């Protein structure tokens, strides 16, 4: 009877060991695929895109074309404004309508063809490195701030990270 009790205890410990091993293995697999678990530091917390433009000067009260420059981190890409697949998240610049600077039109650059090593037959339309969004805007005389957000999803060759929103603030001087 004592032998049976040890057998059950050993079985319980064996089951516990298997569960711990399975959770550890699952955690390693999730990290390898770029999935964020808990508060572990990973590239998913990094923005991977930055605004390079910081100030522009325009003629006050008159429609002007300006370019906002953005830079995507090396080794990453983001979908263009018009991705080839409707399931992909497009890059979109949304400007604050309450701003003194009025945006009349936005023009996004054409994306470049990008092929994932694991799926070369399915080309993507992406931005890499530096890209520029042109805007036709009207600014009042004096100093103003163009305020908005860039919505995008950064990916590397293995996985895509959660969609991000980058705050955009550019000083505009109307002369």
Spans of model-derived segments:
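Arg/Gly-rich low-complexity intrinsically disordered repeat tracts
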Residues: 2-14
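Bacterial N-terminal signal peptides
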Residues: 14-31
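Extracellular/lumen-exposed scaffold segments
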Residues: 31-175
């Amino acid at each position: 009877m004592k032998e049976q009790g040890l057998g059950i205890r050993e079985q319980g410990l064996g089951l516990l060991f298997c569960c711990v091993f399975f959770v550890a293995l699952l955690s390693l697999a999730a990290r390898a695929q770029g999935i964020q678990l808990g508060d572990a530091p990973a590239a998913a917390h990094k923005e991977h895109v930055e605004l390079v433009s910081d100030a522009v000067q325009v003629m006050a009260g008159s429609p002007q074309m300006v370019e906002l420059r953005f830079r995507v981190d090396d080794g990453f890409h983001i979908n263009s404004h018009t991705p080839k697949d409707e399931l992909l998240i497009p890059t979109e610049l949304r400007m604050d309508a309450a701003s003194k600077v009025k945006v009349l039109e936005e023009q996004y650059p054409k994306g470049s063809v990008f092929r994932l090593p694991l799926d070369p037959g399915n080309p993507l339309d992406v931005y890499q490195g530096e890209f520029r969004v042109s805007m036709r805007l009207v600014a009042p005389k004096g100093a103003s701030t163009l305020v908005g957000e860039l919505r995008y999803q950064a990916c590397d060759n293995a996985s895509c990270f959660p969609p991000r929103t980058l705050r955009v603030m550019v000083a505009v001087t109307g002369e």
